[in-house]
């Protein structure tokens, strides 16, 4: 049976949104902080805590307590969001014209792992004429890591 936790951050204005700020607020480090997944409530593995920070994801709060997301739930809910909330796709050049900004100035996350794409990953989409996808009003593409893993998966399925 779960014990009821006391809310850490009652005031929504004082809630840290990113992991480094949460660590500072709790006077701990990214190497020591213990977080649960907002979906499955399992404790994140240390690697998942590091991945959460690397992906620059936001901490969410339930009853004043901070939560992150584990890898399994992140990938699962990313796929659900893609299926339920896909709007449309555009080539990079069209996206730049639509926003009147270069791709490097636009936040585009990986459709699978939610990591922000780096300039090289965005350029790869341009070079290979791959589209970016608008899901729930946010732009997504594929990071190098997810591209490699999906290619490997396809090759082993043959």
Curated annotation (Swiss-Prot):
Metal-binding keyword on record: yes
Pfam families: E6
InterPro entries, alphabetized: E6 (IPR001334), E6_sf (IPR038575)
Main subcellular location: host cell
Places the protein is found: Host cytoplasm; Host nucleus
Single GO MF descriptor: PDZ domain binding
Annotated zinc fingers (unnamed), start-end: 37-73, 110-146
Short motif PDZ-binding domain, span: 156-158
Keyword field: Activator, DNA-binding, Early protein, Host cytoplasm, Host nucleus, Host-virus interaction, Inhibition of host innate immune response by virus, Inhibition of host IRF3 by virus, Inhibition of host RLR pathway by virus, Metal-binding, Modulation of host cell apoptosis by virus, Oncogene, Transcription, Transcription regulation, Viral immunoevasion, Zinc, Zinc-finger
Transmembrane segments: none
Gene Ontology cellular-component annotations: host cell cytoplasm; host cell nucleus
The keyword DNA-binding is assigned to this record: yes
Record-level GO BP terms: DNA-templated transcription; positive regulation of transcription by RNA polymerase II; regulation of Cdc42 protein signal transduction; regulation of proteolysis; symbiont-mediated perturbation of host ubiquitin-like protein modification; symbiont-mediated suppression of host apoptosis; symbiont-mediated suppression of host cytoplasmic pattern recognition receptor signaling pathway via inhibition of IRF3 activity; symbiont-mediated suppression of host transcription
HAMAP family membership: HPV_E6 (MF_04006)
Additional observations: Belongs to the high risk human alphapapillomavirus family. The cancer-causing human papillomavirus E6 protein has a unique carboxy terminal PDZ domain containing substrate. Part of the antigens expressed and presented within HPV-positive head and neck tumors.
Family to which this protein belongs: Belongs to the papillomaviridae E6 protein family.
Protein purpose: Plays a major role in the induction and maintenance of cellular transformation. Acts mainly as an oncoprotein by stimulating the destruction of many host cell key regulatory proteins. E6 associates with host UBE3A/E6-AP ubiquitin-protein ligase, and inactivates tumor suppressors TP53 and TP73 by targeting them to the 26S proteasome for degradation. In turn, DNA damage and chromosomal instabilities increase and lead to cell proliferation and cancer development.
Subunit record text: Forms homodimers. Interacts with ubiquitin-protein ligase UBE3A/E6-AP and thus forms a complex with human TP53. Interacts with human NFX1 and MAGI3. Interacts with human IRF3; this interaction inhibits the establishment of antiviral state. Interacts with human TYK2; this interaction inhibits JAK-STAT activation by interferon alpha. Interacts with host DLG1; this interaction leads to the proteasomal degradation of DLG1.
Protein name: Protein E6
Organism: Human papillomavirus type 16
Gene name of this polypeptide: E6
């Amino acid at each position: 049976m779960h014990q009821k936790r006391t809310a850490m951050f009652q005031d929504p204005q004082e809630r840290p949104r990113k992991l480094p700020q949460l660590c500072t607020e709790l006077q701990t480090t990214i190497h020591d902080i213990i977080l649960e997944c907002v979906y499955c409530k399992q404790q994140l593995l240390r690697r998942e805590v590091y991945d959460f920070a690397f992906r620059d994801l936001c901490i969410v709060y339930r009853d004043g307590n901070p939560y992150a997301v584990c890898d399994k739930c992140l990938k699962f809910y990313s796929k659900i969001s893609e299926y339920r909330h896909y709007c449309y796709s555009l080539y990079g050049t069209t996206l730049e014209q639509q926003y009147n900004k270069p791709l490097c100035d636009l936040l585009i996350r990986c459709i699978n792992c939610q990591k922000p794409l780096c300039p090289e990953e965005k350029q790869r989409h341009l070079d290979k004429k791959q589209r970016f996808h608008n899901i729930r009003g946010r732009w997504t593409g594929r990071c190098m890591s997810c591209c490699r893993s999906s290619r490997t998966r396809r090759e082993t399925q043959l």
